[in-house]
Amino acid sequence: MRPAHLNTVLDEEFLGAQNGSHTPVMLWGAPGVGKSQIIAQIGDRHDIPVIDIRLSQMEPSDLRGIPFRDHDKVEWAIPAMLPNAERHGNKGILFLDEITSAVPSVSAAAYQLILDRKLGEYEVPNGWAIFAAGNRQGDRGVTYAMPSPLANRFSHYDVDIHLDDWVAWAYQNNIHESIIAFLRFRPELLFDFDPAHNPVAFPSPRSWEFTNRALQKFSDKPVLLLGTLQACVGPSAGIELKAFIDSLDQMPDLDAIIRGEDIKAPKEIDLQYAVASALVGRAIRAKNDDNAEEIFGHILSYAKAFRQKEMGVMLVSDLLRAVGDDLFNVPAFSQWAESIGDILLYD
């Protein structure tokens, strides 16, 4: 399932924890596809704590607690990391990450916690959702087969790679427009992992975020830039990205486009992607300006300049995701919509 749809599912499952209809959710996916980040987004959106427990680093006693003698009986000291309404609040997410990397004895300790929301005398507070994530056995990580009793305690979702969802996230998180444009140009490089070769650096949603950091730190150090890009996404993708960035000095004048001047779209496909991504970035930065509607209108007008109408559709679709439904109120939007004829704006 694509990340945008998973966000909706997880939102509903979190809300279900408030009314007793919650089902624990297990997210499956290769390394770096964004499983943990999807959970973090749910926490941010609802302004709730996310307790992230890495089960691969646990022993059974870490979950069950430590016994201690109390006069003529034995009590259990409940681990402080587990959700507690007084310490952590009445609502939140208990996230069991790397669950498929946990040794079987730890998985067994988690059975009751996940299904019954109990572990010995401990109870997960009402209002807390339980989510988990892990890699698949074919991903060359340290993984164990999930026991059937544990698997049957979850609803299961595979995390798909979806470029449009990643692009929407990238604009919201200030990923450099050149990286967004490059992945629009080479979408197959958003995720390129071959378990058979087990590379140490490879393209993934997570490693492209690292690449953005490298670009910010080393763009003014050309001797180091290529090596740092390759260190994040691997030798081949790093070389391609560096060549793409080097070609951006041939881009048309973006300021002139924003001013509404008649500027031709570049003929080169890679530059077209670069221009489209850069204009969406400009629109985001101008969203709260007094002349935002005018800027949006000039970008919409420029969307008609592309020889391939699909390129204009992509630009306006990304623009809509970035600035919201206010775009429909810009007079130039209806003019652009009429110009694309039988091509529909895609979601």
Model region roles, listed by residue range:
Residues 144, 204, 323-326:
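Alpha-helical interaction segments
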Residues 11, 44-47, 52, 62, ...:
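Acidic-enriched, low-complexity/disordered segments with a strong bias for Aspartate over Glutamate
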Residues 36, 236, 346-347:
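Compositionally biased, intrinsically disordered low-complexity segments
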Residues 27, 75, 207, 327, ...:
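Residues in intrinsically disordered, low-complexity segments of regulatory proteins
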